[in-house]
Amino acid sequence: MVTAVRQNPGIITWLKQLRVHQYVKNSLVFLPVVTSHQFTYRAISFALIACAAFSLCASAVYMVNDLLDIEADRQHPKKKYRPLASGAIKPLHGKIAVPVLLALGFASAAVVSSEFCLVLLAYLALTTAYSISFKRKMLVDVVVLAMLYTIRVIAGAIAISVPLSAWLLAFSMFMFLSLALMKRYSELALRIDHNLPDPSNRNYKLDDLAIVGCLAVSSGFNAVTIFALYINSSAVEQLYARPEVLWLVCPVLTYWIGRAMILAHRRMMNEDPIVFAIKDRVSLITGALIAALVLLAMSKK
């Protein structure tokens, strides 16, 4: 018997399907605003529009992903409750929503610039390739995920018309690779705890858990090393009055990465580290501390 919820999914069901809680990832477009110190009305406005464009297109991608993985998700201990997998939203309605979301996303992108539209198109092409193929290839999947995060940073720079920083790109790539590996670690740990077999839609074995954890930590610490090298670069002297203060960011970042991995090992982190970070009190305090240190480094002597 079909329930009323399945016949008439409410706004909460649709918001869950659109993964509105994941929109925090698209705030990465603001990173170039912060690192370039472009706190103007124009820069912030364009960054907001860019964030909205990515959010709409990301929702379309999530919809496509769930349509492709609907059978596998129905066998997953947590993903089976997703609206499409559970039947709360009909697959037909999901297919209709995809072009609508994409049209709204690119209409927003056109307000920013044609270059931004091209970056958004590249993001969609890569994420589509990820959904169809790359997500099933060991390690290729996490590298592509890191690239998808980094593309958001690139898009943010293009949206506000500032040069791309090689330091920022290198830091972003390693940091996001670490987060992607943590996500895979959490997924494998969940399957082990529920006595599930090796994932059918991922090219990982349950025995890979330890090495995936090691790769996550090493990639995260590489990001910290890149940040430390950045502090000694000439670019820092042009942007910060007190660059020596930025050294304090290194131990804070090291602490957060190590703690996140330990919590993942203890099964105290959900499958997505970024979503975990915005709900975790210690992570929020850590982020606030880093922001305070950056502001102090910017302040005049």
Where are these regions (language model features)?
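Acidic (Asp/Glu-rich) catalytic motifs at the cytosolic membrane interface
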Residues: 57-85, 134, 140, 181-189, ...
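Topogenic membrane-insertion module of multi-pass membrane proteins
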Residues: 1-74, 87-99
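Short, amphipathic, aromatic/basic-enriched membrane-interface segments that mark the entry/exit
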Residues: 14-21, 83-94, 111-116, 134-142, ...
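Alpha-helical transmembrane segments of multipass membrane proteins
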Residues: 30, 34, 103-107, 125-129, ...
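Multi-pass membrane catalytic core of lipid/isoprenoid biosynthesis enzymes
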Residues: 70, 75-120, 166-177, 213-220, ...
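C-terminal membrane-associated helical module and adjoining short loops/tails
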Residues: 1-15, 132, 150-301
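Short, aromatic-rich membrane-interface segments at the entry and exit
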Residues: 42-47, 114-120, 138-142, 163-169, ...
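Hydrophobic transmembrane helix module of multi-pass membrane transport proteins
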Residues: 121-149
